[in-house]
A protein has these predicted regions:
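Periplasmic binding protein-like
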Residues: 1-24, 56
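Bilobed periplasmic-binding protein-like "clamshell/Venus-flytrap" ligand-binding domains
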Residues: 1-2, 6, 47-82
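Generic hydrophobic alpha-helical scaffold/packing signal
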Residues: 10, 14, 29, 41, ...
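Short, solvent-exposed loop/beta-turn-alpha elements that line the ligand-binding surface or hinge
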Residues: 14-42, 75-104
Length: 104
């Protein structure tokens, strides 16, 4: 599986689907290559405006959904329980509790 290192779509899209990561040069083990995807990914990577960057990442993901270079077999879920007097229990992008927000 693949675990997110930091909260950005780039952390999945670039190493797993960029043409530059194919042919043994990264984790694109299916050797997926798409000029359209690469163009959108590179546009997102060059973008400094967060909203526009997100739009480019979304468009790149739409190309992946259309091409379907991989078939996801499972997705990580998280479940938790807490006492009724414990508040603000939430989880971060790695599915770990955000301990600094929990209050009693």
């Amino acid at each position: 599986g693949w675990m997110l290192d930091y909260p950005s779509a780039e952390d999945y899209l670039n190493p797993l689907y960029a043409s530059s990561s194919a042919d043994g040069h990264g984790s694109n083990d299916g050797d997926y290559k798409s000029a359209e995807f690469d163009k959108l990914l590179n546009a997102a990577l060059a973008q400094t405006d967060v909203k526009k960057r997100t739009e480019d990442f979304t468009k790149a993901q739409e190309v992946l959904a259309k091409d379907l270079p991989v078939i996801p077999l499972w997705n990580d879920n998280v479940a938790a329980a807490s006492a009724t007097n414990v508040k603000n229990v939430s989880f971060d992008y790695t599915n770990l509790p955000t301990y600094n927000t929990i209050t009693k």
